[in-house]
Amino acid sequence: MDTIAARALTVMRACATLQEARIVLEANVMEILGIAINRYNGLTLRGVTMRPTSLAQRNEMFFMCLDMMLSATGINVGPISPDYTQHMATIGVLATPEIPFTTEAANEIARVTGETSTWGPARQPYGFFLETEETFQPGRWFMRAAQAVTAVVCGPDMIQVSLNAGARGDVQQIFQGRNDPMMIYLVWRRIENFAMAQGNSQQTQAGVTVSVGGVDMRAGRIIAWDGQAALHVHNPTQQNAMVQIQVVFYISMDKTLNQYPALTAEIFNVYSFRDHTWHGLRTAILNRTTLPNMLPPIFPPNDRDSILTLLPLSTLADVYTVLRPEFAIHGVNPMPGPLTRAIARAAYV
């Protein structure tokens, strides 16, 4: 299936170079389109031309690219338009070894297949405590019963620790059971002035320390912590104290948008509004997948099928921009006039 996806990308990108009818095509583009169009026309009985000039010819070429995109991703879109019928035989065209594919397309598909079949350490974009169910007021003393050291979450990437005079304790537990981190990068600071439960202000005296694995860490400097070594706080002074510990970022095996080059841009290209026809077409295609049909996914896609849907669909969007096809989509009423931000915004409601 990798070669089929690579051929689909190659042919669609070749079609996206047809910016004008009199353009001088590169030799490899002529070879790719010549073989692909000949095979496609022979199997589907369509009349795609290499240099589309009329609206009907542009539509035929776009429908060929749409067939290839759907075949490469294994999507059966069904009856979405009175002007278009999906040709299942297109998979046979893409399986033809005579159709060349570019090194770039092959490398991109290989990267997707390789990255989605394994896991690796990645810097996570969300706060370490993002999914916590409760939070505490920053800078306000809080001590649980029968404790001398209490750590609480006070933000999506922040905890604060309240310490009694002379108290020492391990705050590692508050990090446990969250996000399965491989490495956490911390910065700790003294909370110079904080409010006691009664509302009076109190100062944290110098001398409070935070240590990792028994080694004192300097305040205000990034600390690399594996989540396993003891994370101790110590207040050797004769007054209550508070410290703040911020998770600058952390690394885990969760997939991110960095797993594939320009994945963020590809997602934006897919979900961008071009006109109501494209908006309806994209929605109809994504309705047959696990991806959201209108707005980008909340979390990065982490499976091969999803990424190999987004990549060809993004290329199809480029082809749509270049060929400017005009056809009907069931349930879509195109709005005449120039595209404005208000029109695009209204389409997502």
From Swiss-Prot:
The keyword Phosphoprotein does not apply. GO terms for molecular function: host cell surface receptor binding; structural molecule activity. GO terms for cellular component: viral envelope; viral outer capsid. Pfam families: Orbi_VP7. InterPro entries: Capsid_hemagglutn, Orbi_VP7_capsid, Orbi_VP7_capsid_C, Orbi_VP7_capsid_N, Virus_capsid_a-hlx_vir. Transmembrane segments: none annotated. SUPFAM superfamilies: A virus capsid protein alpha-helical domain, Viral protein domain. The keyword Glycoprotein applies. It comes from the Viruses. One of its GO terms (biological process) is fusion of virus membrane with host plasma membrane. Keywords: Capsid protein, Glycoprotein, Outer capsid protein, Virion. Its main location: virion. It is found in: Virion. Glycans are attached at N287. Belongs to the orbivirus VP7 family. The VP7 protein is one of the five proteins (with VP1, VP3, VP4, and VP6) which form the inner capsid of the virus. Homotrimer that assemble in a complex of 260 capsomers on an inner scaffold composed of VP3. This is Core protein VP7. It comes from Bluetongue virus 17 (isolate USA) (BTV 17).
